[in-house]
Amino acid sequence: MAETRKKSLSVIYNGTEAWSELFPVMDRFTYTDSVDQSDTISFEISDRDQKWVKGWIPERGDIIEPCIKTENWNYEGERLTLLCGSFVVDDFSFSAAPLRGSINGVSAPVDSCFKETQNTKTWENATVQMIAGEFAAKYGLSLVFDADDIQVEKTEQSKQTDSDFLKQICEKYGLGYKVYAKRLVIWDYRRYFAQAPILTLSPDTVRSWKYHSTMQGTYTGVRVSYKNPKTKEMVDVLVGTEERLYKTNQKADNEAEAKLIGEGVLLKANRKASTMQITTPPYLSLTATRTVRISGFGRMDDVYFIESVKHSITRKAYDMQLQLSRISECSLKQG
Protein backbone atom coordinates (compact mmCIF):
# COMPACT_ATOMS: atom_id res chain seq x y z
CA MET A 1 0.00 0.00 0.00
CA ALA A 2 1.34 3.41 -1.02
CA GLU A 3 2.48 5.73 1.73
CA THR A 4 0.29 8.80 2.29
CA ARG A 5 1.62 12.17 1.26
CA LYS A 6 2.18 14.35 4.31
CA LYS A 7 2.93 18.02 4.89
CA SER A 8 3.69 19.80 8.13
CA LEU A 9 5.28 22.90 9.61
CA SER A 10 7.76 23.52 12.34
CA VAL A 11 7.43 27.01 13.85
CA ILE A 12 9.84 28.59 16.32
CA TYR A 13 8.34 31.75 17.85
CA ASN A 14 10.75 33.94 19.83
CA GLY A 15 12.94 30.91 20.36
CA THR A 16 10.13 28.59 21.52
CA GLU A 17 8.38 25.82 19.57
CA ALA A 18 4.90 27.13 18.69
CA TRP A 19 3.50 24.77 16.05
CA SER A 20 1.52 22.80 18.64
CA GLU A 21 -0.34 26.02 19.50
CA LEU A 22 -0.73 27.21 15.90
CA PHE A 23 -1.82 23.94 14.31
CA PRO A 24 -5.32 23.71 15.89
CA VAL A 25 -6.22 27.24 14.76
CA MET A 26 -4.35 27.72 11.48
CA ASP A 27 -6.42 28.11 8.30
CA ARG A 28 -3.60 28.99 5.90
CA PHE A 29 0.15 29.55 5.91
CA THR A 30 1.87 31.38 3.06
CA TYR A 31 5.55 31.88 2.45
CA THR A 32 6.80 34.00 -0.45
CA ASP A 33 10.42 33.61 -1.52
CA SER A 34 11.22 36.55 -3.82
CA VAL A 35 14.11 38.03 -5.78
CA ASP A 36 13.13 41.70 -5.81
CA GLN A 37 11.43 42.04 -2.44
CA SER A 38 11.92 40.84 1.10
CA ASP A 39 10.62 37.33 1.76
CA THR A 40 7.33 37.29 3.65
CA ILE A 41 5.19 34.90 5.69
CA SER A 42 1.57 35.02 6.79
CA PHE A 43 -0.50 32.92 9.19
CA GLU A 44 -4.30 33.11 8.90
CA ILE A 45 -5.94 31.73 12.04
CA SER A 46 -9.42 31.09 13.45
CA ASP A 47 -9.24 32.11 17.11
CA ARG A 48 -12.51 30.52 18.29
CA ASP A 49 -11.24 30.03 21.87
CA GLN A 50 -9.83 33.59 21.98
CA LYS A 51 -6.43 32.33 23.11
CA TRP A 52 -4.52 34.56 20.71
CA VAL A 53 -6.57 37.72 21.04
CA LYS A 54 -6.57 37.54 24.86
CA GLY A 55 -3.26 36.05 25.90
CA TRP A 56 -1.02 35.20 22.95
CA ILE A 57 -1.45 38.36 20.90
CA PRO A 58 1.77 38.97 18.96
CA GLU A 59 4.01 42.00 19.22
CA ARG A 60 5.66 43.84 16.37
CA GLY A 61 9.28 42.75 16.34
CA ASP A 62 8.61 39.15 17.42
CA ILE A 63 10.80 36.61 15.59
CA ILE A 64 9.24 33.67 13.71
CA GLU A 65 11.29 30.86 12.12
CA PRO A 66 9.08 28.50 10.08
CA CYS A 67 10.15 25.30 8.36
CA ILE A 68 8.11 23.32 5.78
CA LYS A 69 8.32 19.52 5.75
CA THR A 70 6.94 17.01 3.23
CA GLU A 71 6.91 13.21 3.15
CA ASN A 72 6.27 10.82 0.23
CA TRP A 73 5.27 13.70 -2.04
CA ASN A 74 7.14 12.79 -5.22
CA TYR A 75 8.03 9.20 -4.34
CA GLU A 76 7.70 6.83 -1.37
CA GLY A 77 10.25 7.39 1.35
CA GLU A 78 11.04 10.94 0.27
CA ARG A 79 11.47 13.39 3.14
CA LEU A 80 12.21 17.03 2.39
CA THR A 81 12.67 20.09 4.57
CA LEU A 82 12.61 23.75 3.51
CA LEU A 83 13.98 26.29 5.96
CA CYS A 84 12.03 29.47 5.26
CA GLY A 85 14.36 31.74 7.24
CA SER A 86 13.93 34.21 10.08
CA PHE A 87 11.07 36.73 9.99
CA VAL A 88 10.20 39.83 11.99
CA VAL A 89 6.49 40.31 12.79
CA ASP A 90 5.68 43.64 11.15
CA ASP A 91 1.89 43.48 10.88
CA PHE A 92 -1.01 41.65 12.51
CA SER A 93 -4.77 42.08 12.73
CA PHE A 94 -7.89 40.49 14.25
CA SER A 95 -11.53 40.73 13.22
CA ALA A 96 -14.92 39.28 14.15
CA ALA A 97 -17.32 37.65 13.76
CA PRO A 98 -16.16 34.93 13.43
CA LEU A 99 -12.94 35.76 15.27
CA ARG A 100 -10.04 35.52 12.85
CA GLY A 101 -6.49 36.77 12.87
CA SER A 102 -3.63 37.40 10.49
CA ILE A 103 0.03 37.43 11.58
CA ASN A 104 2.52 38.66 8.99
CA GLY A 105 6.30 38.73 8.99
CA VAL A 106 9.09 40.04 6.77
CA SER A 107 12.63 38.80 6.28
CA ALA A 108 14.71 41.75 7.45
CA PRO A 109 17.18 42.66 10.17
CA VAL A 110 15.63 43.00 13.62
CA ASP A 111 16.94 46.59 13.58
CA SER A 112 14.19 48.41 11.64
CA CYS A 113 16.59 51.28 10.87
CA PHE A 114 17.75 49.26 7.82
CA LYS A 115 14.50 50.11 6.03
CA GLU A 116 13.31 53.18 7.91
CA THR A 117 16.15 55.55 8.81
CA GLN A 118 17.51 57.86 6.10
CA ASN A 119 21.27 58.36 6.07
CA THR A 120 23.80 60.41 4.12
CA LYS A 121 27.33 59.21 3.45
CA THR A 122 29.99 59.34 0.73
CA TRP A 123 32.17 56.36 -0.22
CA GLU A 124 35.42 56.82 -2.14
CA ASN A 125 37.85 54.19 -3.44
CA ALA A 126 35.45 51.48 -2.28
CA THR A 127 34.00 48.29 -3.75
CA VAL A 128 30.46 46.91 -3.80
CA GLN A 129 31.53 44.10 -1.48
CA MET A 130 33.10 46.58 0.94
CA ILE A 131 29.91 48.67 1.06
CA ALA A 132 27.72 45.58 1.50
CA GLY A 133 30.05 44.27 4.20
CA GLU A 134 29.73 47.50 6.15
CA PHE A 135 25.93 47.27 6.09
CA ALA A 136 26.00 43.57 7.03
CA ALA A 137 28.19 44.30 10.06
CA LYS A 138 26.03 47.28 11.03
CA TYR A 139 22.89 45.12 11.23
CA GLY A 140 24.38 41.92 12.61
CA LEU A 141 24.15 39.96 9.34
CA SER A 142 26.66 37.65 7.70
CA LEU A 143 27.52 38.57 4.10
CA VAL A 144 27.24 36.11 1.20
CA PHE A 145 28.73 37.78 -1.90
CA ASP A 146 28.26 35.60 -5.01
CA ALA A 147 29.63 37.97 -7.64
CA ASP A 148 32.89 39.43 -8.88
CA ASP A 149 33.73 42.48 -6.82
CA ILE A 150 33.26 45.86 -8.51
CA GLN A 151 35.38 48.94 -7.94
CA VAL A 152 33.45 52.09 -6.97
CA GLU A 153 35.53 55.26 -7.29
CA LYS A 154 32.92 57.45 -5.61
CA THR A 155 29.26 57.11 -4.67
CA GLU A 156 26.95 59.04 -2.38
CA GLN A 157 24.07 57.94 -0.20
CA SER A 158 21.89 61.03 0.05
CA LYS A 159 18.99 60.92 2.52
CA GLN A 160 18.28 57.28 1.70
CA THR A 161 17.67 54.27 3.89
CA ASP A 162 20.51 51.77 3.91
CA SER A 163 18.18 49.23 2.26
CA ASP A 164 17.24 51.55 -0.62
CA PHE A 165 20.83 52.67 -1.17
CA LEU A 166 22.17 49.11 -1.27
CA LYS A 167 19.44 48.11 -3.72
CA GLN A 168 20.34 51.09 -5.91
CA ILE A 169 24.01 50.11 -5.94
CA CYS A 170 23.23 46.49 -6.78
CA GLU A 171 20.77 47.30 -9.57
CA LYS A 172 23.25 49.75 -11.09
CA TYR A 173 25.70 46.91 -11.76
CA GLY A 174 23.28 44.07 -12.56
CA LEU A 175 23.38 42.54 -9.09
CA GLY A 176 20.56 41.33 -6.86
CA TYR A 177 20.30 41.35 -3.09
CA LYS A 178 18.06 40.09 -0.31
CA VAL A 179 18.11 39.44 3.42
CA TYR A 180 17.57 35.75 4.18
CA ALA A 181 18.10 33.75 7.39
CA LYS A 182 20.14 36.52 9.04
CA ARG A 183 22.36 36.79 5.99
CA LEU A 184 22.80 39.58 3.46
CA VAL A 185 23.01 37.79 0.11
CA ILE A 186 24.25 39.50 -3.07
CA TRP A 187 24.49 37.77 -6.45
CA ASP A 188 25.22 38.51 -10.12
CA TYR A 189 22.20 37.95 -12.39
CA ARG A 190 24.50 37.06 -15.31
CA ARG A 191 26.04 34.26 -13.25
CA TYR A 192 22.68 32.99 -12.01
CA PHE A 193 21.10 33.05 -15.48
CA ALA A 194 23.85 30.63 -16.56
CA GLN A 195 22.96 28.02 -13.91
CA ALA A 196 21.82 24.59 -15.06
CA PRO A 197 18.05 24.12 -14.59
CA ILE A 198 17.19 22.52 -11.25
CA LEU A 199 14.06 20.81 -12.67
CA THR A 200 12.03 20.36 -15.87
CA LEU A 201 8.33 21.23 -15.75
CA SER A 202 5.90 19.86 -18.34
CA PRO A 203 2.12 20.34 -18.74
CA ASP A 204 1.35 17.14 -16.83
CA THR A 205 3.39 18.28 -13.80
CA VAL A 206 1.68 21.65 -13.32
CA ARG A 207 -1.83 22.58 -12.20
CA SER A 208 -2.25 25.80 -14.18
CA TRP A 209 -0.14 28.27 -16.13
CA LYS A 210 -0.18 31.64 -17.88
CA TYR A 211 2.33 33.13 -20.33
CA HIS A 212 2.79 36.81 -21.13
CA SER A 213 5.13 38.59 -23.55
CA THR A 214 5.49 42.34 -24.06
CA MET A 215 7.77 44.90 -25.73
CA GLN A 216 6.60 47.72 -23.48
CA GLY A 217 9.33 48.83 -21.11
CA THR A 218 11.94 46.50 -22.64
CA TYR A 219 15.01 47.51 -24.63
CA THR A 220 17.65 46.16 -27.00
CA GLY A 221 20.38 48.55 -25.91
CA VAL A 222 21.52 51.50 -23.82
CA ARG A 223 24.19 54.18 -24.13
CA VAL A 224 26.26 55.08 -21.09
CA SER A 225 28.90 57.82 -21.15
CA TYR A 226 32.15 58.37 -19.26
CA LYS A 227 34.88 61.01 -19.37
CA ASN A 228 38.15 60.00 -21.00
CA PRO A 229 40.80 60.84 -18.37
CA LYS A 230 43.36 61.83 -21.02
CA THR A 231 41.28 63.90 -23.46
CA LYS A 232 38.64 65.00 -20.90
CA GLU A 233 36.01 64.29 -23.58
CA MET A 234 32.79 62.35 -22.97
CA VAL A 235 32.75 58.91 -24.59
CA ASP A 236 29.54 56.98 -25.32
CA VAL A 237 29.51 53.21 -24.82
CA LEU A 238 26.76 51.21 -26.54
CA VAL A 239 25.65 48.09 -24.68
CA GLY A 240 23.41 45.92 -26.84
CA THR A 241 21.92 47.20 -30.10
CA GLU A 242 20.17 50.39 -31.20
CA GLU A 243 16.70 49.11 -32.24
CA ARG A 244 14.99 50.13 -28.96
CA LEU A 245 17.47 52.29 -27.11
CA TYR A 246 17.08 53.17 -23.43
CA LYS A 247 18.09 56.69 -22.48
CA THR A 248 19.94 56.99 -19.19
CA ASN A 249 21.51 59.91 -17.37
CA GLN A 250 23.84 57.66 -15.39
CA LYS A 251 27.53 58.48 -15.85
CA ALA A 252 30.40 56.04 -15.48
CA ASP A 253 33.97 56.53 -14.30
CA ASN A 254 35.46 54.40 -17.07
CA GLU A 255 34.59 52.12 -19.99
CA ALA A 256 34.37 48.95 -17.89
CA GLU A 257 31.93 50.57 -15.46
CA ALA A 258 29.90 51.97 -18.38
CA LYS A 259 29.41 48.42 -19.69
CA LEU A 260 28.36 47.16 -16.26
CA ILE A 261 25.88 50.01 -15.83
CA GLY A 262 24.41 49.37 -19.29
CA GLU A 263 24.07 45.66 -18.58
CA GLY A 264 22.39 46.46 -15.25
CA VAL A 265 19.80 48.67 -16.98
CA LEU A 266 18.94 46.00 -19.56
CA LEU A 267 18.89 43.10 -17.11
CA LYS A 268 16.42 44.92 -14.87
CA ALA A 269 14.14 46.04 -17.72
CA ASN A 270 14.10 42.88 -19.82
CA ARG A 271 13.29 40.42 -17.06
CA LYS A 272 9.63 41.31 -17.68
CA ALA A 273 9.80 40.82 -21.47
CA SER A 274 8.46 37.24 -21.42
CA THR A 275 7.12 35.74 -18.22
CA MET A 276 5.22 32.70 -17.00
CA GLN A 277 3.08 32.17 -13.92
CA ILE A 278 2.78 28.50 -13.00
CA THR A 279 0.95 26.75 -10.17
CA THR A 280 2.47 23.41 -9.22
CA PRO A 281 2.38 20.78 -6.50
CA PRO A 282 5.19 21.28 -3.94
CA TYR A 283 8.68 20.95 -5.41
CA LEU A 284 10.82 22.17 -2.53
CA SER A 285 13.93 22.34 -4.72
CA LEU A 286 12.40 25.29 -6.61
CA THR A 287 13.55 28.51 -4.95
CA ALA A 288 13.96 32.10 -6.11
CA THR A 289 17.21 32.75 -8.07
CA ARG A 290 17.30 29.17 -9.46
CA THR A 291 16.48 28.24 -13.06
CA VAL A 292 13.91 25.78 -14.38
CA ARG A 293 13.33 24.26 -17.82
CA ILE A 294 9.85 24.54 -19.36
CA SER A 295 9.17 21.69 -21.82
CA GLY A 296 6.10 20.60 -23.76
CA PHE A 297 4.55 24.08 -23.97
CA GLY A 298 5.35 24.63 -27.66
CA ARG A 299 7.11 27.88 -28.54
CA MET A 300 7.20 28.83 -24.86
CA ASP A 301 9.71 26.06 -24.15
CA ASP A 302 12.92 27.52 -22.75
CA VAL A 303 14.96 27.97 -19.58
CA TYR A 304 13.42 30.41 -17.10
CA PHE A 305 14.69 32.29 -14.06
CA ILE A 306 12.62 31.88 -10.89
CA GLU A 307 11.63 35.38 -9.75
CA SER A 308 9.46 34.26 -6.84
CA VAL A 309 7.86 31.20 -5.26
CA LYS A 310 4.71 31.49 -3.15
CA HIS A 311 3.93 28.49 -0.94
CA SER A 312 0.30 28.20 0.19
CA ILE A 313 -0.56 25.53 2.76
CA THR A 314 -4.01 24.73 4.17
CA ARG A 315 -5.22 21.66 6.04
CA LYS A 316 -6.23 20.01 2.75
CA ALA A 317 -3.90 21.42 0.11
CA TYR A 318 -0.39 22.60 -0.69
CA ASP A 319 0.27 24.66 -3.82
CA MET A 320 3.27 26.57 -5.11
CA GLN A 321 2.93 29.54 -7.45
CA LEU A 322 6.02 30.34 -9.53
CA GLN A 323 6.76 33.66 -11.22
CA LEU A 324 9.28 33.07 -14.02
CA SER A 325 11.17 35.24 -16.51
CA ARG A 326 12.48 33.89 -19.81
CA ILE A 327 16.26 34.04 -19.71
CA SER A 328 16.76 34.24 -23.49
CA GLU A 329 14.75 37.49 -23.47
CA CYS A 330 16.98 38.92 -20.72
CA SER A 331 20.25 38.01 -22.43
CA LEU A 332 22.36 40.85 -23.79
CA LYS A 333 22.43 40.94 -27.59
CA GLN A 334 25.48 42.58 -29.10
CA GLY A 335 25.40 44.52 -32.33
Regions found by a protein language model. Name each.
Residues I41-E44, G105, T120-V144, Q157-Y180, ...:
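Amphipathic, non-transmembrane alpha-helical segments in extracytoplasmic/periplasmic proteins
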Residues M1-I63, A108-V110, V239-G335:
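Juxtamembrane "anchor/assembly" segments of surface/extracellular structural proteins
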Residues A2, R100-I103, S107-D111, F145-K210:
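Short beta-strand-centered interaction patches in the first periplasmic/extracellular domains
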Residues L201-Q250, N254:
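C-terminal amphipathic alpha-helical segment
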Residues S42-E44, E65-C67, S86-D90, S102-V106, ...:
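Soluble periplasmic/extracytoplasmic beta-strand elements of cell-envelope proteins
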Residues W52-S142:
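Surface-exposed cap/loop segments at beta↔alpha junctions
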Residues I68, D188, G296-G298:
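Conserved "cap/hinge" positions at secondary-structure junctions
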Residues E78-S95, K121, T155, R190-F193, ...:
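Short, compositionally biased
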